[in-house]
């Protein structure tokens, strides 16, 4: 007979408040993603089609985080989503794939004043991803950060 393991979700757990001499308003949660890219809360929304389009990007930006517009859109649709977020004067990122055909997408979305471009791949520790990073570095404005991943190896 198989044993059923216990599992919990966020609704099952409560953090018990404790005495503190620090007020929440005195806490600084900001982080530097790069030397020039700072966010007020250390949260980025996932570049998934069920998670981040303009409404989530705007909400994340207004809260102090960063939304990454997913790449499962046409290039034109992705640009529209980026522009909607940028119109609210908040930070925004956008995802591209790791293939050479995605360089066309990268070239076009990099003209949209992105704060960060994300190379979205299941396995980022590959020669192909390294090569696409080099190509995007040559295309991007200096102020646009590059993020590549996912990487789960120790190297």
Model regions and ranges:
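An N-cap/entry alpha-helix motif that binds or orients negatively charged groups
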Residues: 1-43
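Alpha/beta enzyme core
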Residues: 2-3, 7, 13, 51-155
